[in-house]
């Protein structure tokens, strides 16, 4: 049976450019007619996406699937860890919640996780011409090397060649590359076929002596120096993107708190990128600034994040905001916070118990063991009934009179969320609430912006994937990585 061409991208650090490089290479090969799939053995992220087979994977792999012209599938990210505390995480295997484990217990569970990884790998390499693999963090973390399934442990088991990427914009790129290589075992070093330097800006001629030294020092080629691509929009996996982009005159101010276990913050990308919206993240210790709209985003640990929000004094700021006529929206965990009570009888987010919500909507939420995972579409219960589409990822079941006025009507007939009688507060389980152009325009009008231009996030994402692929084709030596027939032309 045919076996796919495989290549693994590992990085010297987190955010070195692994996800971006895999997405860009996937788009390059997709445009050349190659049947290509992305793969990340193990991902740790609170931003996830719903798959075509009813599971969830990291958003980076969903973006890479889009770059490859595919629907997201759970095999693209067979092990997803969703941290719920500083020392524990929910373990998602093949798209479904398997169990929750402490970091120490997960170490003992790794052989089971590795079996799931290899099962997905075996399916992909027989179904596609090429599989592009993304590592996690750095392969040189000494304390994580035992039973590693995310980096060289996987590369060795699957016999996959590796390229190493480093971010020169951070500084120290040569130390990162040489140091990482030297911390690997001899067999692992032999897998590293070359280096990619990411996010370079300046005169390449001034960098060339360093590249020559690196090649002489390591005996491995620099496969390319990728430029810093200003304004590139690709879904962030964990790190919050800079929200304060340079804009002209804005029509609306939107703020959102950054709680410790914030999840799926990409829900707010459309607001962050909108030219007429002044969007701001509000971090710990910061006062909630005056705004037209406050958005409470999703959370992986709703009770803990709500307690933390109160400790910041933001509950009082939200009440003050509403008294002055401001609008408030809650998405998923943020929606659950708006009710009277949150119950966790099974201790799914820590200790079993209940906590009072903000009391702004007449409803209560109970966390249940079964997670709802579904792509959905429908209409918003706002003027003109704009279309909305997105996905549900939640373990909570909400009940109460507030739900008699749903914020959305799904195509299957279900109502979702709540819209307060005075129209000030909107809550929903729909992730991607702002992504549909018609829904975005309607929500901005509801928040007080009036008629504003729309932003097509999907079109922007596609255009930036092509811009990334164009840069890779210009600056990377693809002939050293892939068969000649894929590279010609």
UniProtKB/Swiss-Prot annotation:
What is a biological process (GO) this protein takes part in?
Answer: cobalamin biosynthetic process
* Pathway where it operates: Cofactor biosynthesis; adenosylcobalamin biosynthesis
| InterPro entries, sorted | Class_I_gatase-like, CobQ/CobB/MinD/ParA_Nub-bd_dom, CobQ_GATase1, CobQ_N, CobQ_synth, GATase_3, P-loop_NTPase
List, for all copies, the residue spans of the domain called GATase cobBQ-type.
251-439
GO MF term (any one): catalytic activity
Keywords of the record, alphabetical order, are: Cobalamin biosynthesis, Glutamine amidotransferase
Q: Would you say which domain of life the source belongs to? A: Bacteria
- Thylakoid as a keyword? no
Q: Which residues form the active site?
A: 332, 431
Record bears the keyword ATP-binding: no
Pfam families xref list: CbiA, GATase_3
Query: Which family does this protein fall into?
Result: Belongs to the CobB/CobQ family. CobQ subfamily.
Q: What does this protein do?
A: Catalyzes amidations at positions B, D, E, and G on adenosylcobyrinic A,C-diamide. NH(2) groups are provided by glutamine, and one molecule of ATP is hydrogenolyzed for each amidation.
Task: Please state what the protein is called.
Answer: Cobyric acid synthase
Naturally occurring in which organism (per UniProt): Aromatoleum aromaticum (strain DSM 19018 / LMG 30748 / EbN1)
Taxonomic lineage from the root? Bacteria, Pseudomonadati, Pseudomonadota, Betaproteobacteria, Rhodocyclales
């Amino acid at each position: 049976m045919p076996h796919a061409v495989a290549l693994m991208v590992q990085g010297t650090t987190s955010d070195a450019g692994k996800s971006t490089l895999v997405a860009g290479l996937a788009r390059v090969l997709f445009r050349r007619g190659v049947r290509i799939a992305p793969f990340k053995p193990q991902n740790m992220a609170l931003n996830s996406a719903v798959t075509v087979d009813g599971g969830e994977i990291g958003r980076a792999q969903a973006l890479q699937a889009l770059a490859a012209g595919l629907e997201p599938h759970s095999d693209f990210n067979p092990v997803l860890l969703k941290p719920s505390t500083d020392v524990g995480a929910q373990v998602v295997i093949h798209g479904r919640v398997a169990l929750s484990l402490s970091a120490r217990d997960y170490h003992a569970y790794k052989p089971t996780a590795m079996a799931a990884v290899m099962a997905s790998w075996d399916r992909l390499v027989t179904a596609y011409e090429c599989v592009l693999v993304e590592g996690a963090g750095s392969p040189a973390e000494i304390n994580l090397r035992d039973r590693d399934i995310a980096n060289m442990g996987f590369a060795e088991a699957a016999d996959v060649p590796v390229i190493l990427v480093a971010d020169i914009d951070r500084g120290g790129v040569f130390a990162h590359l040489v140091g990482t290589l030297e911390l690997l075992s001899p067999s692992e070093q032999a897998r590293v076929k070359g280096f990619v330097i990411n996010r370079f800006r300046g005169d390449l001629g001034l960098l060339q002596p360093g590249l020559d030294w690196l090649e002489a020092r390591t005996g491995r080629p620099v496969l390319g120096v990728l430029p810093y691509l200003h304004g590139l929009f690709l879904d962030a996996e964990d790190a919050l993107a800079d929200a304060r982009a340079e804009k002209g005159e804005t029509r609306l101010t939107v703020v959102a708190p950054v709680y410790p276990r914030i999840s799926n913050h990409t829900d707010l990308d459309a607001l962050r990128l909108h030219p007429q919206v002044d969007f701001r993240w509000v971090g710990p210790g910061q006062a909630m600034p005056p705004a037209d709209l406050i958005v409470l985003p999703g959370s992986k640990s709703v009770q803990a994040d709500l307690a933390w929000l109160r400790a910041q004094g933001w509950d009082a700021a939200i009440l003050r905001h509403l008294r002055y006529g401001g609008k408030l929206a809650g998405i998923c965990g943020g929606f659950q916070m708006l009710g009277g009570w949150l119950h966790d009888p099974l201790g799914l987010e820590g200790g079993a118990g209940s906590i009072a919500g903000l009391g702004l909507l007449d409803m209560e939420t109970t966390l249940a063991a079964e997670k709802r995972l579904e792509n959905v579409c429908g209409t918003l219960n706002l003027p003109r009934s704009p279309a909305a589409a997105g996905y549900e990822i939640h373990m909570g079941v909400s009940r109460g009179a507030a739900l008699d006025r749903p914020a959305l009507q799904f195509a299957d007939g279900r109502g979702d969320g709540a819209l307060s009688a005075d129209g000030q507060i909107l809550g929903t389980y729909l992730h991607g609430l702002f992504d549909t152009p018609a829904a975005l325009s309607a929500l901005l009008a509801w928040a007080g912006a009036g008629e504003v231009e729309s932003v097509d996030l999907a079109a922007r994402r596609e255009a930036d994937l092509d811009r990334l692929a164009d840069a890779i084709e210009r600056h990377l030596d693809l002939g050293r990585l892939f068969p000649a027939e894929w590279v010609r032309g």
